[in-house]
């Protein structure tokens, strides 16, 4: 048996602190899940629906609950025909469907909330971009101003996706860039 009373008191105290931290984290997970069920879920739904209505944004807000304590609230801009299609024959066209993007608030395994942007994509046309993580929050951190910022970032990113082009001026690189404005006397 290990003697824990000898000069190992520092190590034992370190271990005790780590155990206390672990217990606190596990208790927080339970508390975060309770807050989600008791109030946060409904608060997020209400705020997102309010912003959709207030801004006249064509979107749906719904809860996806395939697994307990991993629910997600999804603000979706919906699905539409992309305007592109494959002609099967003179009478039939197979339309490519465009998913317009979504803003997601999802519970994580530890009760915290991850906020994600799913970018638009067109089925069978390239690969969808991976979701963008806006942030991970403890329930008490999600105040109303955060929701407005998340929505602004979502709309900006979706707008940039829709307005994609490669006409952005190229960034010049090279040795002489810093010297381009210098007047060099000719010999």
Give the location of each predicted region.
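Charge-rich, low-complexity N-terminal segments
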Residues: 1-67
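Intrinsic disorder/low-complexity polar-acidic segments
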Residues: 71-187
